[in-house]
Every structure is written in structure tokens, then in C-alpha cells.
Amino acid sequence: MLTCNKAGSGMVVDAASSNGPFQPVALLHIRDVPPADQEKLFIQKLRQCCVLFDFVSDPLSDLKWKEVKRAALSEMVEYITHNRNVITEPIYPEAVHMFAVNMFRTLPPSSNPTGAEFDPEEDEPTLEAAWPHLQLVYEFFLRFLESPDFQPNIAKKYIDQKFVLQLLELFDSEDPRERDFLKTTLHRIYGKFLGLRAYIRKQINNIFYRFIYETEHHNGIAELLEILGSIINGFALPLKEEHKIFLLKVLLPLHKVKSLSVYHPQLAYCVVQFLEKDSTLTEPVVMALLKYWPKTHSPKEVMFLNELEEILDVIEPSEFVKIMEPLFRQLAKCVSSPHFQVAERALYYWNNEYIMSLISDNAAKILPIMFPSLYRNSKTHWNKTIHGLIYNALKLFMEMNQKLFDDCTQQFKAEKLKEKLKMKEREEAWVKIENLAKANPQYAVYSQASAVSIPVAMETDGPQFEDVQMLKKTVSDEARQAQKELKKDRPLVRRKSELPQDPHTEKALEAHCRASELLSQDGR
């Protein structure tokens, strides 16, 4: 690349195929020249568009020539879209070169913080200043790839592994508009160049590995996963071993990263696509999710519950049997979560007909796992909505298998009695220890210096247990009431945030009046 020596110019010229620096000039329209000269003019315009301009340090420089380039790009987009047999062999190297000159650049360092301070949902992205030109270059290249005249056998000499690697590096751009074009461009290249497919997958793997184990920061993970979702959908059966390894060693560890919320929908789609292709992968996938289950991040836990329900929607009954016990042990913990959104999301599983059919077929294993958590939280959870959902789940279990429900109730009652007996024995043991201490001659001396508190009767965790019949009645009544509450037409009231307590802010709010009020006062 060469820099123009014109004073005050921000132009940079790529002159690989010319004799030296050149100034852009407004060329004729392609449609205004004879057909025999159109190819030559097309190539001239492609070379003209290799001139780069400064949009950052001096946005107002070279406005005339920036408009010349914009018009040329726009014209070429229209030309290859609406004309046939215009992409001849000499056009391929020029078109690829023009794209490379404009696009392949070192991305600026992120203006947002990295590491724990980075919040992908709050931090504003830095938009590309040269987008008026870059957008048209992307549009041209996409039309070029999608044209009926495009021949991959000719293009593969220019669109090679090096080109793909540089294209993938651009996915870390902060500008979402650019990443959207990149996603479509890479997908078209993957579809048309069979020889590059394995290489593209390998390089995407490398980006993911670096993201998971080194940087934990990359702007294009969601877009890359979206491309992979389409690729996975086209995998032939039976799945190759390399594809299974990709799922287990690359996709599943992506659940560990802090910024999961940015790309989770695309990741969940990829995982479900694999399970639809090969149901035998269900057990390792679910066990990996349980392994990576968040311990202290409730919003992330809700995401895991969403994904798990998507998996259960496509699970085979034979595979469900393998994972149901560890799965429902985790669900029991979620139902007990003090974070109401986690508990609520877990209890919504009981509104899913297919999941309920799986539970019904395996109630003998599942109900004993879930019953203690459901019963305890029906009395002790702080959120009333959760009470209604729990009673609904208990009612469904009760209707599913009355005898099993009674057995679980009695078993739970027996366990509570055991806990009370253990607690009583513990209290009695402490009383014996205190009495032995009192029998010691030195007791009086030390008791004055340090008063010994009388043991307090300790209560076991959870509420007092009800009679079985009373429990059934309570469950039915509460579930019915919860259904009524859900069906009520609630008025749409906007929740208002509390006003700040700062007196200066309050005075400013009181003194504030709308512009229309001021205008009406002036009108008087």
C-alpha cells in the first residue's frame, strides 16, 4: 500500500497492479459504454475502489473522492445483480483483491473493558467509521458470490485458506453490522468451496478454544455459532467422530464462560441440533450441563433451565431413563432456590406436556426425589407465585399416581420424625454434658466467670407435617386457587421506579415543566 503525497489528503492507495500512486477520478457509468468495453471499465472501477480514505482522524477530508468511490461501489453492486455473464475470468482476482484491500485490516483495540468488568449487554460497541464504504464492499462481494455466473473452480485460486483466516479474524469487530455481513459471507463461502469446509471448521474451533481458555472475550461468538447451527443441520448420518468431539470438547465448555448470555440461544440451538441427529449423545450432553451448572449466578441458571427444557423436548424416552435421576436432583435444588426466577423456571417444566408424559412413565423414580423439595417450599418459600406453581406440581403428581403420592408422603413424614428424634437425642446429650460439668468441683468457679446458657430446643428445617388427607385437600385447593390467579385479567400497570432521595434531585423534578407548558405561557 502507498500513501498519496497530496497535502492534507487522507487517502491510502493500493497500487499493486498500477505504476504508482493515482488519484481517483469519476469514470463513466458502465451502462454508458459499449458492451465490448464494459469488462475493462468494470476492472478500472474495481481498482479505483482500492483507494482507502480516512474516516477517523479527518472525516471531512476528500469528501468529493469519497463520494466517487461510494457511487462506483453502488453502481457495481447494481451491475452484477441485474446483468448476466458479466463475471468473467479476469474479474475474479480484481474483485477478491478489492475486497481484501478494503476489509482485511488490524482491528482497533476494544474501547470496552475486558475481563470481569466487561458487560456485553451494557457496554456500547464502537461502530466502524468507514461503514459507508465497507457496507457497499460487503454487498458487492455477497452479490459476487451469489451470482449465477460465479464459478468456484476459478475463484478457489484467490479465495483460499489465507483469505478465510483473515476473514475469520474480522469476526472480532465490535460493529454488529459488520459481523452480520461477515456471517453471511462466510456461510456462502462454506457452501460453495467444499475444499475449505474442514479448514473453516478447524479455525472456528481454534477461535472457540482461545475464547474459552485464554481471553474470554470475543465479539463474534454468537455469529460463528449461528453459522455452525446451519452447518450442523447439514451433517450426514451417522455423525463422524470429529463432529462428536466438537460437541463434547468445544461446544459444551462454552457454557463455562461468564458472557454466556450473549450467545446462549445460538449455542443451545447447536446442541439441540446434535441431539436431533444422534440421540445417544444425550447422556454426555446432560451430564456436562450438570457439571457446568452455575452455583452462584442465577440468571445463568435460568439459561441452563431453558436449554435443558429444549433438550427434553427432543429426548428419546430410552435416553431420558439414563439421565432422569441426576437431572431431577438438580431440578429439586432449583425449586428450592431463593431466587424466584430460578424456582419459577424449574416449575414451568410441569406445564410441558411431553416432559409430563416422561415424568408419568417414570414417576416411581422421580417423585421420591422431588417430593421433599416441593413440600418444604410449598410452606417456606417467600414468593407466593412459587407456592401456586408448587401446589400445581404436587397436584399433577397426586393425580398421576395416588398410591405413590401417599407412600412418598408417609416416607417424608417418617424421615421428619427421625430428624426430630435425632435432634432430641442431641439436646439430651448436651444436657448430660452440662450435668457432668456441674458435678465438677471447679464448676462454681468457672460458672461465675462465664455464664453457661441453657440449651435451646432446636427446630428441624421445614414446617409441621400435615395429615395425608389434609395435605391432599390443601394441594387441590391451593392448585385450584393458583390457576384462578393465573387466569385473572390483571390490569396493565407500568411499574414505576422509586424516586431518588437526593433533595436536590427532588427539587429539580418539582421545578421541571414540559416545553409545551413554557410555550403556552409565552403565547399568553
From Swiss-Prot:
Keywords annotated in UniProt: Acetylation, Centromere, Chromosome, Nucleus
Source species, domain of life: Eukaryota
Major subcellular location class: nucleus
Modified residues (N-acetylmethionine): M1
InterPro entries given in the database record: ARM-like, ARM-type_fold, PP2A_B56
GO cellular component: chromosome, centromeric region; nucleus; protein phosphatase type 2A complex
GO molecular function: protein phosphatase regulator activity
Subcellular location: Nucleus; Chromosome, Centromere
Tissue-by-tissue expression: Highest levels in heart, liver and brain. Lower levels in skeletal muscle, spleen, kidney and lung. Isoform 4 is testis-specific.
Chain intervals for the UniProt region annotation (Disordered): 476-508
Biological processes annotated in GO: proteasome-mediated ubiquitin-dependent protein catabolic process; signal transduction
UniProt function note: The B regulatory subunit might modulate substrate selectivity and catalytic activity, and might also direct the localization of the catalytic enzyme to a particular subcellular compartment. The PP2A-PPP2R5C holoenzyme may activate TP53 and play a role in DNA damage-induced inhibition of cell proliferation. PP2A-PPP2R5C may also regulate the ERK signaling pathway through ERK dephosphorylation.
Subunit and partners: PP2A consists of a common heterodimeric core enzyme, composed of PPP2CA a 36 kDa catalytic subunit (subunit C) and PPP2R1A a 65 kDa constant regulatory subunit (PR65 or subunit A), that associates with a variety of regulatory subunits. Proteins that associate with the core dimer include three families of regulatory subunits B (the R2/B/PR55/B55, R3/B''/PR72/PR130/PR59 and R5/B'/B56 families), the 48 kDa variable regulatory subunit, viral proteins, and cell signaling molecules. Interacts with SGO1. Interacts with SGO1; the interaction is direct. May interact with TP53.
PANTHER family reported in the protein's UniProt record: SERINE/THREONINE PROTEIN PHOSPHATASE 2A PP2A REGULATORY SUBUNIT B (PTHR10257), SERINE_THREONINE-PROTEIN PHOSPHATASE 2A 56 KDA REGULATORY SUBUNIT GAMMA ISOFORM (PTHR10257:SF3)
Family in the record: Belongs to the phosphatase 2A regulatory subunit B56 family.
Record's protein name: Serine/threonine-protein phosphatase 2A 56 kDa regulatory subunit gamma isoform
Organism: Mus musculus (Mouse)
Gene it is expressed from: Ppp2r5c
